[in-house]
């Protein structure tokens, strides 16, 4: 199947920080702000963390609406991106302010699952790299949360 490339899901434009080591960046005056108040960060010669989140969340919601329109509610689809993009999308789906997104861990090649419904997004998994995801073939149905959290997903 066709896999489009969406530039709105590319990593943050770190500008002059691009390609530098984390240990080197940690010596910059901006580093503590990146860690504690990312919503206030504009990378020198790059973009702001807030604009990165706005474009990536808009792209995910746009793709989700298009897949639902074409394949129906509960359609399962995949987006592949980078850590800060994924963390910012998860923060939005969890209703977290961008300043809290550093609390979310996203490992390389991990899977996070968000389902957008009419009333709100629901987060089904974050940062997982274990287990069989075949239960997704049944689709994910979001609506009101079950009382007591429900009994989890039913295996196919």
Feature roles, as predicted:
Residues 9-11, 40, 112, 117, ...:
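Short, solvent-exposed coil/turn elements at secondary-structure transition points
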Residues 1-32, 156:
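Phosphate-coordination/substrate-recognition cap region in phosphate-metabolizing enzymes
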Residues 58-120:
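Active-site-adjacent alpha-helix immediately C-terminal to a catalytic or transition-state-stabilizing loop
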Residues 16, 24, 28-29, 115-156:
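An N-terminal RHG(E/S)-centered segment typical of histidine phosphatases
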């Amino acid at each position: 199947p066709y896999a489009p490339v969406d530039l709105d899901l590319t990593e943050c434009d770190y500008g002059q920080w691009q390609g530098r080591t984390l240990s080197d960046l940690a010596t910059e005056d901006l580093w503590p702000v990146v860690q504690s108040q990312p919503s206030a960060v504009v990378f020198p010669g790059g973009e702001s963390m807030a604009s990165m989140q706005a474009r990536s969340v808009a792209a995910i919601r746009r793709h989700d609406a298009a897949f639902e329109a074409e394949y129906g509610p509960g359609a399962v689809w995949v987006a592949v991106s980078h850590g800060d993009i994924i963390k910012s999308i998860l923060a939005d789906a969890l209703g977290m302010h961008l300043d809290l997104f550093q609390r979310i861990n996203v490992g390389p090649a991990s899977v996070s699952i968000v389902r957008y419904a009419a009333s709100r997004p629901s987060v089904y998994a974050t940062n997982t790299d274990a287990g069989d995801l075949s239960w997704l073939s049944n689709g994910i149905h979001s609506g009101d949360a079950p009382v007591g959290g429900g009994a989890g997903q039913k295996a196919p």
